[in-house]
Amino acid sequence: GCVRDMVRGLTPKDYDIATDARPETVQTLFPRTYAVGAHFGVIIVLEDGFQFEVATFRSDDAYIDGRHPSAVHFSSPEADARRRDFTINGMFYDPVAGEVIDVVGGQADIAAKLVRAIGDPGKRFAEDRLRMLRAVRFAAVLDYQIDKGTWDALVANAASINQISAERIRE
């Protein structure tokens, strides 16, 4: 949500970092780290009293359980963006160049106040059913509309919402 907030002109509440550095490289560069999902390329870095989530750019294989990919592969910013849920969450910020990297149309959808799934909405919701609830939450909290194709897929898959654990919904 950091880049989404920046594009909306808001100060981000937290900063998640995406990089081409592999998890083991991140752990070598920073003395205080712990792995929360190293197999997914996610390391927590503790620095100057702050906690940063550092994720390696990745692409995912097929989702087998409605939540987790069967395998991940470290990849590029473009591939990483295309595996994400919604265009408004698929952007990166390059602090050196001072520019937003947007290969999925997130900036246009923010300007249009639209929640749109990246790629095939039905596939996005089948990968992780919680994304349906996230779409509704983003629309409500941000006062956005849900894109018609995304909405149609949400309605078509709504019966599978009961397969989401209560613990995940509370997260």
State where each predicted segment sits.
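Catalytic cores of the polymerase beta-like nucleotidyltransferase superfamily
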Residues: 2-171
